[in-house]
Amino acid sequence: MPELPEVETTRRGIAPHLEGQRVSRVIVRDSRLRWPIPEDLDVRLSGQRIVQVDRRAKYLLIQAEVGTLISHLGMSGNLRLVEAGLPALKHEHVDIELESGLALRYTDPRRFGAMLWSLDPHNHELLIRLGPEPLTDLFDGERLYERSRGKSIAVKPFVMDNAVVVGVGNIYATEALFAAGIDPRREAGSVSRARYLKLAIEIKRILAYAIERGGTTLRDFIGGDGKPGYFQQELFAYGRGGQPCKVCGTTLREVKLGQRASVYCPKCQR
């Protein structure tokens, strides 16, 4: 599943080509995504100028003069720019054609993504209960410490909870916990304030660096500009179970936490 850096990479790739452009028409070839695409999306969006392309957690917000298209890439979705009128292939479900002659094309083989319309996106039911963005001043180690008190849940699924902080998915939680030296199995309530301060710093650092590197390409993700990400070449823990730790050489172990695979170093993380 594309994580926050991949979604931000997509946003940065498509925004310069969308912002200020007027939509000429919307072509929906298959509306059967996680939730059905609104039947009147073409009527609502066509003729409007796109004001801004923003992101909230893993949702892309394509803001028009009146209303906002909320898009989620799901498990296998991607958005890329093509020439308007380019014949569509299988799984290319939606084209948003622009007066510039380009079209924003949404592809999603598994159809777990979303394209929804809202006049008040930040109060939409999918967004209203989300926690703070990790790369803002609203998120820090103090928040992690305070929210974790009394919790017996393992620290990794705790930091992956979107009510605590958004966008820290499996890949980046694994990497941040490795960098902070925290065993992902440790109870969230047992982690000290000092270690949460370190973890928050590492979450911010790793996410920012992954965005700079274009995200992490695993399986299906392709950025909005057609370029894959390269951060996967620098992973220390994620997907490396059974391999030697890049820091100490100890064999990395893999366990299941919250139904997700989690890799850690038994020597570097405690």
UniProtKB/Swiss-Prot annotation:
Pfam families: Fapy_DNA_glyco (PF01149), H2TH (PF06831), zf-FPG_IleRS (PF06827). InterPro entries: DNA_glyclase/AP_lyase_DNA-bd (IPR015886), DNA_glyclase_Znf_dom_DNA_BS (IPR015887), Formamido-pyr_DNA_Glyclase (IPR020629), FPG_cat (IPR012319), MutM-like_N-ter (IPR035937), Ribosomal_uS13-like_H2TH (IPR010979), Znf_DNA_glyclase/AP_lyase (IPR000214), Znf_FPG/IleRS (IPR010663). CDD domains: EcFpg-like_N. Its cofactor is Zn(2+). One of its GO terms (biological process) is base-excision repair. It catalyses: Hydrolysis of DNA containing ring-opened 7-methylguanine residues, releasing 2,6-diamino-4-hydroxy-5-(N-methyl)formamidopyrimidine; 2'-deoxyribonucleotide-(2'-deoxyribose 5'-phosphate)-2'-deoxyribonucleotide-DNA = a 3'-end 2'-deoxyribonucleotide-(2,3-dehydro-2,3-deoxyribose 5'-phosphate)-DNA + a 5'-end 5'-phospho-2'-deoxyribonucleoside-DNA + H(+). Keywords: DNA damage, DNA repair, DNA-binding, Glycosidase, Hydrolase, Lyase, Metal-binding, Multifunctional enzyme, Zinc, Zinc-finger. GO terms for molecular function: 8-oxo-7,8-dihydroguanine DNA N-glycosylase activity; class I DNA-(apurinic or apyrimidinic site) endonuclease activity; damaged DNA binding; zinc ion binding. The keyword DNA-binding applies. DNA binds at H91, R110, K151. Binds 1 zinc ion per subunit. Monomer. Involved in base excision repair of DNA damaged by oxidation or by mutagenic agents. Acts as a DNA glycosylase that recognizes and removes damaged bases. Has a preference for oxidized purines, such as 7,8-dihydro-8-oxoguanine (8-oxoG). Has AP (apurinic/apyrimidinic) lyase activity and introduces nicks in the DNA strand. Cleaves the DNA backbone by beta-delta elimination to generate a single-strand break at the site of the removed base with both 3'- and 5'-phosphates. PANTHER family: FORMAMIDOPYRIMIDINE-DNA GLYCOSYLASE (PTHR22993:SF9). This is Formamidopyrimidine-DNA glycosylase. It comes from Pseudomonas syringae pv. syringae (strain B728a). The gene is mutM.
